[in-house]
Amino acid sequence: MPSNALWLRADQLSSVSPTVLDWLFDEGSLTRRLTALADGAFRVEPLLEGWQTLRDDECQGLDVPPGSSGWVREVYLHGHDRPWVFARSVAARSALEGSGFDLALLGTRSLGELLFSDSAFERGPIEVCRYPAAGLPAEVRAEGLWGRRSRFSRGALGVLVAEVFLPSLWDQAGIADV
């Protein structure tokens, strides 16, 4: 993602509706919330998985040196067969090796379900931004979409999960003041 993403905490925001804030800073499982909103018609569509050089903001979020290599997984979280959320999850190669945690085996499973079902993972603070359009897949690319990220840690392993809320989610949730 371009370096112009400005990640903010809740206390750094102004003029955001309480309804949107509730979605952005909900510390529960987004997968579970989306599944409930979709009345069970939820699925994960993998878009990209593999080793890549991590983006500068990702290296900073994982406390690893700039230019570090890591596993990158990009997916859509669908409700009623519409992409509601674009998610990009990354973990540094140095932390993954020997961790026993293999992101490559997830397939169409939700990473969130895995993280929330393993009590050894601790979630760090949630940060939000207006996600740069250049970091989104072409078919959903738009300016000004809300994104959030947080780091899940288990010992030396950190997994940084970023989620971008797409207009189709807000439509389904009946939220107009985005």
From Swiss-Prot:
What's a GO cellular component annotated to this UniProt protein?
Answer: cytosol
| Keyword terms of this UniProt record | Cytoplasm, Lyase, Pyruvate, Ubiquinone biosynthesis
What does the entry give for GO biological process?
pyruvate biosynthetic process; ubiquinone biosynthetic process
> What EC number(s) are associated with this protein in UniProt?
4.1.3.40
Q: Which Pfam family, any one, appears in the UniProt record?
A: Chor_lyase
Q: Sorted alphabetically, which InterPro entries does this protein's record hold?
A: Chorismate--pyruvate_lyase, Chorismate_lyase_/UTRA_dom_sf
Q: Which reaction does it catalyse?
A: chorismate = 4-hydroxybenzoate + pyruvate
- Coiled-coil ranges from the UniProt annotation: none
Q: Which GO terms describe its molecular function?
A: chorismate lyase activity
* Function field: Removes the pyruvyl group from chorismate, with concomitant aromatization of the ring, to provide 4-hydroxybenzoate (4HB) for the ubiquinone pathway.
This protein is called Probable chorismate pyruvate-lyase
